[in-house]
């Protein structure tokens, strides 16, 4: 009996060490007595959400969620029609306001996204850091953007100064999630600007994708991945694209992987496998492949991929 109690106590202690509580208290007076939900992304590529909690907003417009997280996680909260997002971290306490500019608008099929208003946000919280960085970067780029066309060399120099400043800031921050956020914000919002001295596509591939681990749980990494490989099937060599079509039609995963490996931006096996899933996802919305072929390949990947997370993503799509 003593042994069982000891093991139980140890398991409880380990659970506490791995997971930590967070709390969200919100004000949503426009939606009193309605249901409020809290979701988590199963994966960012499919965009599929799984329900974590449901509560009812009080007559006073107050709602509350309590949960556990082992690290920084992006969650979605909202009603059935209107949604917003929040990053939560261990021991995080959040006071937010959930207000729609058009609460009486019946066109809820527009799926309006609401921007949360935070109160008393801790300066060490990930939301504080992200919101502050986004505002600062937007202002910096706005201030120097005039130089891009009228003084290109000065613009390039100021971009260099920006990156040096960010490197210095990165050394002072211990949050790997925030550092990755900074890195892929620069990749998306700075390096994608067409300016003198801007990195080439191959340099961007090497800097942000080819030589880095895939950050499946980081929304900014996955957003950059989707931008970089957007309509990828239409950007590769036509002959390769046609051969890939035949491989998909035959349901030959080994062949489609082998064909994609010929492209310089798909040189890493795990990344290449993810690219293939993304190609199939985008093909659902165009005429490149019959829907039956797409679904068959996704089904095969969900059963046969050597990467467990890819099996999940393919299943979710």
Set out the residue ranges of the language-model regions.
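Bacterial Sec-dependent N-terminal signal peptides
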Residues: 1-27
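A non-transmembrane, solvent-exposed segment enriched in polar/low-complexity residues
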Residues: 21-174, 181-184, 189-208
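Helix-turn-helix repeat elements of alpha-solenoid scaffolds
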Residues: 155-163, 246-254, 288-295
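Amphipathic alpha-helices of TPR/Sel1-like and other helical repeat/solenoid scaffolds
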Residues: 158-169, 256-259, 297-301
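Short solvent-exposed coil/turn linkers within tandem alpha-helical repeat scaffolds
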Residues: 172-177, 215, 303-309
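Charged, long alpha-helical assembly modules
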Residues: 175, 181-268
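Structural detector for internal amphipathic alpha-helices that build alpha-solenoid repeat scaffolds
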Residues: 278-286
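N-proximal helix/coil linker or "cap" segments that precede and/or mark the start of modular domains
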Residues: 285-317
């Amino acid at each position: 009996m003593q042994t069982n109690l000891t093991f139980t106590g140890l398991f409880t202690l380990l659970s506490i060490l791995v997971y930590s509580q967070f709390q969200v208290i919100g004000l949503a007076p426009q939606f009193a007595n309605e249901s409020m939900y809290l979701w988590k992304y199963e994966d960012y590529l499919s965009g599929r959400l799984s329900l974590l909690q449901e509560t009812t907003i009080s007559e006073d417009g107050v709602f509350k969620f309590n949960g556990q997280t082992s690290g920084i996680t992006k969650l979605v909260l909202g009603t059935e029609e209107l949604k917003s997002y929040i990053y939560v971290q261990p021991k995080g306490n959040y006071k937010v306001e959930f207000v729609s500019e058009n609460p009486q608008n019946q066109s809820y099929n527009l799926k309006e996204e609401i921007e949360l208003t935070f109160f008393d946000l801790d300066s060490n919280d990930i939301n504080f850091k992200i919101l502050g960085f986004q505002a600062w970067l937007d202002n910096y780029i706005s201030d120097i953007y005039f130089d891009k066309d009228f003084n290109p060399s000065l613009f390039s120099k100021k971009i260099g100064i920006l990156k040096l400043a960010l490197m210095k800031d990165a050394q002072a921050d211990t949050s790997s999630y925030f550092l990755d956020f900074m890195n892929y914000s620069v990749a998306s919002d700075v390096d994608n600007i067409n300016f003198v001295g801007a990195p080439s596509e191959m340099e961007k591939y090497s800097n942000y994708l080819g030589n880095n681990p895939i950050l499946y749980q980081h929304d900014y990494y996955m957003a950059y991945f989707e931008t970089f490989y957007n309509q990828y099937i239409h950007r590769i060599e036509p002959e390769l694209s046609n051969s890939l079509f035949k491989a998909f039609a035959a349901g030959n995963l080994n062949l489609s992987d082998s064909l994609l490996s010929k492209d310089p931006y798909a040189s890493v096996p795990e990344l290449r496998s993810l690219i293939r899933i993304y190609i199939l996802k985008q093909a659902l919305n165009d005429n490149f492949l019959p829907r039956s072929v797409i679904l068959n390949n996704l089904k095969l990947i969900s059963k046969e991929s050597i990467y467990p997370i890819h099996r999940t993503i393919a299943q979710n799509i």
